[in-house]
UniProtKB/Swiss-Prot annotation:
Keyword set includes ATP-binding: no
Keyword Electron transport part of the UniProt annotation: no
Organism name: Mesomycoplasma hyopneumoniae (strain 7448) (Mycoplasma hyopneumoniae)
Protein name (database record): Large ribosomal subunit protein bL34
Domain of life where this protein originates: Bacteria
Alphabetical keyword list: Ribonucleoprotein, Ribosomal protein
A GO BP entry: translation
PANTHER family, per the entry: LARGE RIBOSOMAL SUBUNIT PROTEIN BL34M, MITOCHONDRIAL RIBOSOMAL PROTEIN 34 FAMILY MEMBER
UniProt record similarity statement: Belongs to the bacterial ribosomal protein bL34 family.
Amino acid sequence: MKRTYQPNKRKHLKTHGFRARMSTADGRKILAARRAKGRKRLTVSDK
């Protein structure tokens, strides 16, 4: 049986990256919440 998680960098960034988050109002809410919480990394594109 094939596993459910098949890593793909491009898809990961297209869906969860900073530009993707900024492109929608809800995505910006996520970033605001993570900033408020004090997260070191806001999105997966942060290293």
